[in-house]
Amino acid sequence: MNLSIVIPLLNEEESLEELFTRIDNVCKTSNLSYEVWFIDDGSTDLSWSIIENLKVQHPQIHGIKFSKNYGKSQALHAAFERTNGDVIITMDADLQDFPEEIPELYRMVIEDNYDIVSGWKKKRFDNVMTKNVPSKLFNAAARKVSGVYLHDFNCGLKAYKKQVVKSIDVYGDMHRYIPVLAANAGFRRITEKEVPHQARPYGTSKFGTERFVRGFLDLVTLWFVSRFGGRPMHFFGAVGTLMFIVGFLSAFWLGVSKLIDVARGIYGHLITNNPWFFIALTMMLMGTLLFIAGFLGEMIIRTNREHKNYNIDEVI
């Protein structure tokens, strides 16, 4: 199979039929075999009923229904596990992404041998102050921290080699950082393609300005996880050991100083009256706790790699 098209959605009943019709026309015109995965992330409208009706008419459609709203990352994770296409394309269900871009994205992955092709909505039809400006700041920070030079990390329209999505774990709110996760996994042939953007024809946006705050926090998390996530003991153990050693040496110096004073006949100064005593004690205690945190982190990672943090009601 050439393509798996993955579409997370939340309350998008008005756009689903039009979206699939455009996808179907594009793939048939380009002679591409394909499947579509709709992931209903806790919709409260008729989205799932529409997906079921489309499935009856078009066997290449598949659907995953979450028991509640878990988020875009969990939706992508659930679909990535089930895709069969050589190239996986993700896109939003709100018709702001153009299905007509699919053939060229597919060609760039197959013929140009890119691991990831990310869409770049250079000209956006969003509110300047609440979306465009924060998005530019966010993307600039993401490029600087991650070392992956994309203009639009938030663009939902992306194409991946099958090996990429099968090799990474998308969790939390990390969907916007899939290219960074992929680069950390060794898939470094990443490029971008300028794609058109249009105002949302139906419904309202499900994202507010708070997503950028979460995005920056996720960026810090990603920086840490990419370096120490697989082996937290490398970070916590090293910092904890260093703090313990500094605290121990400080306490040792205080003890030696006290013995020297006693040898000289100087009495009356208790070690506990010296603030360095409490500093040394605190550093030794914190060092021990950090070391234990690193050990517990190792154990948690080893026992929870396969844990899914979402519940699926139905798969069709």
Walk through the language-model features, giving the residues of each.
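Cell-envelope/extracellular polymer assembly enzymes that use nucleotide-activated donors
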Residues: 2-4, 35
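Short, well-formed alpha-helical segments that are part of the catalytic scaffolds
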Residues: 12-27
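Donor nucleotide-sugar binding loop of glycosyltransferases
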Residues: 12-15, 43, 98, 273
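Short beta-strand/loop segment that forms part of the nucleotide-sugar
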Residues: 32-42, 64-65
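A conserved acidic beta->alpha catalytic loop
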Residues: 40-49, 95-96
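Acceptor/aglycone-binding surface of glycosyltransferases and processive sugar-polymer synthases
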Residues: 62-68, 72-82, 87, 99-177, ...
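Hydrophobic helical membrane-anchoring modules
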Residues: 180-316
